[in-house]
UniProtKB/Swiss-Prot annotation:
It holds the Pfam family DUF134. InterPro entries: RNA_pol_sigma_r3/r4-like (IPR013324), UPF0251 (IPR002852). Belongs to the UPF0251 family. HAMAP family: UPF0251 (MF_00674). This is UPF0251 protein CLD_3165. It comes from the Bacteria.
Length: 157
């Protein structure tokens, strides 16, 4: 069974996500879909001028995965430009932020993205999870989730 795809960390979203060639009739335009993480890879490498290792580190993926993503992105952009296709930026397997959580019951450490509300431990199903970063609670994920109260109740029992 293949490993699950890791979320790619993305820091930038474009204001415009659709680009079409000027003067070409709409009925003749074909569309190339550029994933959000592919655009992020090109931004880091070509605009920020980071090396491959720095880019991979920022996106929280391996160097090989980064290379595969940027190769795919550059190929899509080159095809769109040479064939006069539209470029649509959408989709992909990305997140704006990852959070490491720790289960108090089984001590499993796992990652979630903020777009995914995972308040149950994937290992034991417990709801007693805390943010593993500095043994504190993740402000963005745990805020309003009553996680801190649950944890303190479990400590007092």
């Amino acid at each position: 069974m293949p490993r699950p795809t890791k979320f790619r960390r993305v820091e930038f979203f474009p204001e415009n996500n659709y680009f079409v060639p000027w003067g070409k009739p709409k009925c003749e335009i074909h569309e190339v879909v550029l994933k959000v993480e592919e655009l992020e890879a090109m931004r880091l490498k070509d605009i920020e001028e980071l090396n491959q290792e720095q880019c991979a580190e920022k996106m929280e993926i391996s160097r090989q995965t980064f290379q595969n993503i940027i190769d795919s992105a550059r190929k899509k952009v080159a095809i769109a430009l040479t064939e006069g296709n539209a470029i649509k930026i959408s989709g992909g397997h990305y997140t704006t932020k990852l959070c490491k959580l720790k289960c108090i019951d089984c001590e499993e450490i796992y990652e979630i993205n903020y777009e995914q509300d995972r308040h149950l431990c994937p290992n034991c199903g417990s709801e007693k999870v805390i943010c593993n970063k500095k043994a504190d609670f993740c402000r963005r994920w745990c805020k309003g989730q009553n996680r801190k109260e649950q944890y303190e109740e479990s400590k007092n029992k």
